Amino acid sequence: MYEILIIGAGPAGLTAAWEANKHGLKTLILEGDKEVGGISRTVERNGWRFDIGGHRFFTKVDEVYEIWDEILDKEDFLLRPRMSRIYYKNKFYDYPLKASNALLNLGIIEAIRCVLSYFYVRVRPPKNQDNFENWVAARFGWRLYNIFFKTYTEKVWGVDATTIGADWASQRIKNLSLMKAILNAFQINKSGEIITTLIDKFKYPKYGPGMMWETAYKKLLEQGHEIHLSSRVSEISKHDDHYLVTTQEGEIYKVKNILSSMPLAHLPKTIKPEPTSIVKTSGNNLKFRDFLSVALVINEEDAFPDNWIYIHEPGVKVGRVQNYGSWSPYMVKEGKTCLGLEYFVNIGDELWSMDDENLISLATEELEKLSLIKKNSTLEGYVVRMPKAYPVYDLNYSENISNIEDWLTSEHSNIYPIGRNGMHRYNNQDHSMMTAVKSIRNIVLGETNDIWKINVEEDYHEEISTGRSAPVQK
């Protein structure tokens, strides 16, 4: 019987095995895909390397840094400058949003309208602030909301912003408001102290985040862990003192503890005996947003300096543009660069179903329309599709998660959901890793860490213009 079985070989799953190894335990990992890393993997095509979404290696948690440094050697890391901007109506805006830059770019008339709109909502705030639209409008005013938040947010989620829970806004921008942004522009906080930006540089593996998890995979195998790729779990059946885990390939494993990074929505369908109808319905109601990236090889050495640009322009479908050469010069070839256009989609919709050739043509047309590249400078392109990339925070997601959490706590205390999809939480890479570390310590050391509290009650760096957050437990 295996002491610990881990479902998924992304950052959470591999970190769980890494932590278990420190306590003298070997694990079995079952990964449904043919490669490791999950959404943090790096794709290689014809000598070009590109991420599935960008992953800055920055955290406030020392343990996470220690794990990164244990997996990769010092010379495997680069220290890269951080730069991101918003593109809107042929102008670039600082990201995170800075009042001085935003109001200057908008022009004096529009700036006055935005400020007046902000003071209007201070007097007459939206009554119902449980959805994204009203929550943000109450803190920035309706005009700034419509300019900088509505279009991009609805691109990401594919639904009206009134159907997105306020949790999404509060998690990503926490207590920031227009007034705080203005104070930040002058580098002053409530106490009159100078605010400093916590991150203007970040660590990054030479060959992308996939380098981290590919190396972890190889080292774990050398340490004696079992890792089976293309091995998708189809059933978890509970017995007196153990579980039997069955894969689609017909393999059966007897295990004591399970760490699962499979989508939380799928867990109730997988476990036998079946849960109550409330739990099954809650799982069915958890939604995901899918994702595809079109990587274009451009016949220019430096298209722009940013790591990525958020596209708030309503006239194009692309949501964000990655500049892989800005992440690492080792990702691209000399004299050329590679840009990744990110599209937020649903499996089966028009974009997801479009063939690669047409997607490459669309991406090229949109980059040229935005004047981010010169015409006829695209040399080749590649498409990568990623299902279930983003857990959706709709108005009922929290209740659905609570129902599943309560069921697992009462009926399956030896099953530990970990990671972004495993917990249906929009976690950063470091948060996902910490859910794995804390779960292993609960098993091995008898600790009582509440995994569900990680990345819930915290002050986000976004509030002071860093765009990142750090996991804490309270």
Regions of interest found by a model, annotated:
Residues 21-45:
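Glycine-rich FAD pyrophosphate-binding loop
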Residues 46-124:
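Dinucleotide-binding Rossmann-like beta1-alpha1 core, especially the glycine-rich loop
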Residues 112-116, 120-236:
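Active-site/ligand-binding neighborhood in enzyme catalytic cores
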Residues 395-474:
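C-terminal lid/capping helical subdomain adjacent to the catalytic/cofactor pocket in oxidative enzymes
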